A protein has these predicted regions:
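Acidic, metal/ion-coordinating pockets
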Residues: 1-271, 306-314, 369
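Catalytic centers of hydrolytic enzymes
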Residues: 4, 8, 14, 23-27, ...
Length: 453
């Protein structure tokens, strides 16, 4: 059986789209078995190119993930070897700052696009497909400056898309695609007879409304879930993160016909054809057993053993703080094919398992000082915001993963809470004040291992 459906009659070009590849150069363990890999996407692409013209578009975030802290350098060369045709810059592309990103792009043979940020990256590109030119516009995350070392997007950046699309069409583009590094708000579906996840697109629709009608297709990303829908009448979709799935779109040969998003499909767990330092580092970490878990822990709403709670307990005990708190969206190990965002499976725990949960060389948590009553306040406010039924919270920019926080408290009214440093701005927003923090002396990976024993 072919892993992807045959193209619809009248298809001129097929698009395969991915997001947040995160240097997944080798398959890794997930809650549902083996996850996909970059090499698996290449397998799908090569098979599709035997059947019809096919292009690969990506929504960015290439080198976030375990490979960077394991290797000590970002594996840009590995990602540059992938036969991608065009990509948008993700927020993690800016983690090391703009100069480092511009230097890194020198090894990429495909364009990394960013129309809504003035940093020296191209805004658009023309991709030759074998069936006519495809115009591509790249858009990074609208709040990239809050997520990385990037400047804010340009004022009124949505107004740039229309002129870019018209310019591409005037240059001969048969179709124009916008790649946006953002996705829907989603949450695990607790109905055993329903799909693994549910989603709403109000926040994404607000972002795309000024320009969605100017393009033929929107490819999204950034969030762990896969989704298909429409924005202002334009077909849109995004794959799951970490090469878990690929989004398939058929572009019609007839000019008046609309692109058809066929859906997302799992990526096979293919091993890379060539060993590189990054591949060797990932393989070594995957075979380096550092501990054992008696149970399977999942980041899944309602799970018997909720992984964010375990991490919160580990941070609290390691730091001596009165409490620990973990936002589920901040610790991703997989795409949500089964509704799970992170998993620590029963049995041997490897270095790679821990690196997926804390993919930084410096994994020290931070201790945040709290005033009386503030811990209960921040937990309650986060719960109200993350609640999937809270439609008035759909437009909170960081609220795309509607799952409960992991919480561990040693006292009724803790005077400090241990969190990972990147969570501090969210707590400050929820408490509406600046927060004083102190870095811990122990790392989160070591803390989690101790919590498992």
């Amino acid at each position: 059986m072919d892993p992807l459906p045959a193209a619809l009659p009248g298809t001129a070009v097929r698009v395969l789209a991915t997001t947040d590849l995160a240097a997944v150069l080798v398959p890794f363990r997930t809650s549902y078995g083996q996850g996909g890999s970059c090499a698996g996407v290449v397998d799908l692409l090569e098979a599709e190119r035997e059947r019809q013209p096919t292009v690969w578009l990506d929504a960015g975030d290439f080198t976030v993930g375990p490979a960077y802290p394991l290797l000590g350098t970002r594996p840009w060369a590995d990602m540059g070897e992938l036969p991608i045709d065009a990509a948008a810059a993700g927020n993690h592309e800016f983690d090391d700052g703009v100069p480092a990103l511009l230097e890194a792009t020198r090894v990429l043979p495909y364009p990394l696009l960013c129309a809504n940020l003035d940093v020296g990256l191209p805004a658009s590109a023309m991709v030759e497909t074998g069936a006519g030119p495809l115009g591509v516009i790249g858009l990074t995350h609208p709040h990239v400056h809050r997520l990385s070392k990037a400047p804010p997007p340009a004022d009124g950046w949505g107004g740039r898309v229309g002129p870019l699309a018209r310019a591409l069409r005037s240059q001969g583009a048969r179709w124009v695609v916008a790649i946006l590094h953002d996705g829907v708000d989603w949450w695990p579906d607790l109905d055993p007879n329903g799909p693994p996840t549910r989603a709403r697109a109000e926040r994404l629709a607000d972002t795309a409304r000024p320009w969605a009608g100017e393009v033929d297709l929107i490819v999204g990303g950034h969030v762990p879930d896969g989704w298909v829908g429409e924005l202002a009448g334009t077909p849109v979709g995004h794959a799951h993160v970490f090469a878990a799935s690929v989004l398939v779109i058929d572009l019609p040969s007839e000019g008046a016909a609309r692109p058809v998003v066929r859906g997302w499909f799992p990526v096979p767990p293919t091993r890379p054809a060539r060993r590189t330092p990054a591949v060797e580092a990932l393989d070594a970490a995957a075979t380096n057993v550092v501990g054992e878990s008696r149970h399977t822990w999942l980041s899944l709403t309602g799970a018997d053993r909720y992984l964010p709670d375990l991490i919160a307990e580990a941070l609290r005990e390691a730091t001596g703080a009165g409490a620990g708190m973990v936002l589920a969206a901040q610790h991703l190990t997989q795409g949500t094919l089964d509704g799970v965002t992170a998993a620590l499976r029963a049995g041997p725990v490897t270095e790679l398992d821990l690196m997926w949960l804390f993919a930084l060389a410096d994994d020290r948590p931070a201790t945040v000082e709290l005033r009386p009553g503030e811990f209960a306040t921040v937990v309650a406010r986060h719960a109200a915001t993350a609640d999937p039924t809270a439609r008035d919270a759909d437009r909170v920019w960081w609220n795309w993963s509607r799952m409960p926080a992991g919480v561990s408290a040693g006292t009724a009214d803790p005077d400090a809470v241990a969190v990972m440093p990147w969570v501090v701005p969210r707590l400050a927003e929820l408490l509406d004040r600046d927060l004083a923090t102190e870095p811990a002396t122990t790392g989160a990976r070591a803390a989690l291992l101790r919590a498992l024993t």
